[in-house]
Amino acid sequence: MESITGYVDHIVFQNSENGYTVMILMMEGEEVTCVGMCKGLGQGENITAEGEYIEHPVYGRQFKIQNYETVTPTDRVGMERYLGSGAIRGVGEALAARIVKKFGDDTFRIIEEEPERLAEVKGISERKAQEIAIQMEEKKDLREALVYLQQYGISNTLAVKIYNTYGAEMYSVMRENPYRLAEDVSGVGFRIADEIAGRIGIHTDSDYRIRSGILYTLLQAVGEGHCYLPLEQLLCRGAELLGVTEDNIRPQVDNLIVDRKLVAKGEAVFAAPYYYAELNCANMLRNLNIPMAESENLPSQDMAIRKRLERMAENLSMELDELQLKAVEESIKNGLFILSGGPGTGKTTTINMIIRYFESEGMDIFLAAPTGRAAKRMTEATGFEAKTIHRLLELNSALSGDDSRKANFERNQENPLEADVVIIDEMSMVDIQLFQALLKAILPGTRLILVGDVDQLPSVGPGQVLRDLMNSKAFPMVTLEKIFRQAGQSDIVVNAHCINKGEQIALDNKSKDFFLLERSDVNVIYKHMIQLIQDKLPRYVNATPFDIQVLTPMRKGSLGCETLNGILQRYLNPADPCKKEHACGNAVFREGDKVMQIKNNYQLEWEIVGRYNIPIDKGLGVFNGDMGRIREINDTSATLTVEFDDGRRVNYPFSGLEELELSYAITIHKSQGSEYPAVILPLLGGPRMLFNRNLLYTGITRARNCVTILGSSETVRNMIDNVSENRRYTALEQRIREVCDLPEICCLREEA
């Protein structure tokens, strides 16, 4: 690693979010182009940087900075250059020259120790002298903080966050309890805090360490979809993580309960936010579940509603069976209503009838779904605009601070949605935190209609909201089961219902939309997959190769999405001199690639452009599972532009590309809420807990026109027979029963 020293002549580009900087450094009269993460660095500053020279294919020789530290200039030229660079607000080149001429080599000492003397310089008042001194002190403090934190291997980007969080208190936090960082600073988790603690000599059985480890263990469980852990599991997992005994952990669990960071209900231990999320949801649901004013359940009124619905259906040429009509009636009579059912059972027709009824009443109707793809499908199916739930609630990054993990919304109890009816589709995808935010924005008296298929995989985030709502039996609900004539002609729909009931399906390839190609050799599967995507399926379903989606149960392995994406990229979007690309870890992103966002980021800005590239809409937030194409890679600004399927464009800094993955192949779990013209499922076998009925059902119901299974019929049959599922620890059902005074269940449910 080489070291260079010089001053920043000027900044070519600096990303305000992550600090990625392109700058010109002057070294003894020589200009050197430098690139790296240098957040907070400004023009005129003197630095010593470590890194290496690289040869950029377009911009030539550059110095790639790995670490740097700012150094205070000691000569008059350096002092004048720094003060006049714009680093100090209100001081230009002329004023900087007068200051240095007045105080000479003593300039910086005067500013730090006798700032009032700056008023001796023409053009500087006593107030301005103090402002200059304060700015110099702040920059000095930040420089010293960065140097201090670098010794613990903390990047400059994280170091700036830590300093901004604590200020001068940072040093005492680092010495006494670095585990506070894991709770207070976005980007610093338990692992980083634990490494710092080890370096400064904090013992492995420290109370601070054990408390932080317990919270981290529960956070990991939340990442697996749980809202709590049984005490014994928490003790076991915590002991394994921390390398201590369960006896060391138990007292700290009690202390965290006293501190209200944990909540214990019987043997269930919750991180406090998730206990209160479920409890708050239960209370708000109870408040919404009221008979509507126009309904007193009089027989004559029920008959009038039925006749009106029948007339409307006839006028709209809509065919509804008895259960669908009952569903519409329940949505009219109740403040809260749940509509469930599998594919082809008429949920969309029922939703359309509900919308038309309330539209005829002059009511304001809002439609939403968890993802952009699901919202787009809802719009196409109903003819009414549907938004993502995040857009409906008006995500606001200013309320979230610097933490990209947290969502805060403009719409809440103080500023509720101005709607008479809110309809949410794909409820199986909604986690407990998003559901809580939604309910906070809905006033009692507003109708809330929740729609979904409970047999789909549960949400990626914590909870199993739809299943718990239905299991509680506390709210009006209709489950549609009949497969309608048009849907009944689709073997995708018929087979989905058979699979869901545990019935074996025909795999004889006599279908027009459901095929199995029996293959046992992985390389042969690769070959056929490429042929299907490049040629056969696009012609068969009238789509492009990029519309065909490979869905796999696994991330790893020869048929996992990581391996498949590398193979499919080579054939579907090969390297080309006309296409820019950028390496990130083991992946290469190329213009034209199909990509997916793999975590929620509530800070990312997006815009939608119309004709002539004129922005017509903008907002915040890109979410786990959003898919799109790479439109541009810009090496100058170190950004990559993705256009998502719903038209949003997002500029990603190169440093933020760990949030993106190639998506020619994705896991079935990530496909929730999406629909594709054709789906390919490579199924040769794998872990029993993964290769189950629920996963197969979800995978095939993602296809609109064609399902092709590449692999083993035996694997398919085993999956249909396999009802083992990953259990989720949730208690929303229990909380609902408590607040609604329903009979208690004997134990908390553990459902998939």
Identify the residue ranges that each predicted region occupies.
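Loop/turn positions that initiate beta-strands
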Residues: 44-46, 592, 625
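A generic structural signal for residues embedded in beta-strands
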Residues: 11, 49, 597, 630-633, ...
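Pre-Walker A segment
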Residues: 264-342
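Conserved helicase motor core of P-loop NTPases
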Residues: 454-620, 739, 747
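Accessory, non-ATPase domains that flank or precede helicase/AAA+ motor cores in DNA-metabolism machines
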Residues: 1-297, 752
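ASCE P-loop NTPase helicase motor core
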Residues: 325-329, 333-510
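C-terminal accessory regions
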Residues: 617, 624-752
